[in-house]
Regions:
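Active-site cavity-forming subdomains of large catalytic enzyme subunits
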Residues: 1-161, 174-180
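Hydrophobic core segments within long, regular secondary-structure runs in both alpha-
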Residues: 162-172
Length: 180
């Protein structure tokens, strides 16, 4: 989940996961089972999301200069609220220190380094940010456990690995084909 630093809900977004994780710690201390398969854990929100705040150079300059920052309506761009830019960045840092979210994406840099800018701007990424591209484009990642290709004698089973790679590529092509 990526939210622009000028979004009117940014303050709530910054703290949403940290607040839920504090709730989880309190419940655990009260004796509730907070293991991942527990029904008690199911009451903790936002745990299956990777949150990031999208910041611009203009925001970072406002932080450096100690300026205020406008939170703007998504519908018409009107200013909904004005906040202290440094305080907002401090909140991002504090929430991230508490629960590892939100991360930060640097919008200006991402779009400056865009490999195909004529296709449109990049507004977000997949959850771990290893794939950056335009809206409505696919990120279909897959992986193979290389230890599964280790033979009993310690050698790497190259033919089996090559076969697995072929199957994975075919599966990815099918996923892309059916997603259209």
């Amino acid at each position: 989940v990526v939210l622009d630093v000028a979004h009117p809900d940014i303050e709530e977004f910054i703290w949403c996961k940290a607040k839920e994780e504090r709730k989880a710690r309190v419940l655990e201390q009260a004796g509730y089972d907070m293991s991942l398969d527990s029904p008690d854990w199911a009451s903790i929100q936002y745990q299956n999301a990777n949150n990031s705040v999208r910041v611009t150079d203009a925001f970072m300059e406002a932080v450096v200069e100690g300026k205020e920052w406008n939170l703007t309506a998504r519908t018409d761009g009107s200013v909904v609220e004005t906040v202290d830019a440094r305080a907002l960045l401090k909140d991002i840092a504090e929430a991230s220190w508490q629960c590892a979210d939100p991360g930060v994406q640097y919008d200006t840099t991402i779009n400056a380094w865009h490999t195909s800018p004529n296709t449109g701007r990049i507004n977000a990424s997949n959850p771990c940010s290893e794939y950056m591209h335009i809206d409505d484009s696919a990120c279909n990642l897959s992986s193979l456990n290389l230890m599964k290709f280790r033979k009993e004698d310690g050698e790497f089973d190259v033919p089996m690995f090559e076969h697995a790679v072929d199957v994975m590529f075919l599966a990815q092509e099918i996923i892309v084909g059916y997603s259209s």
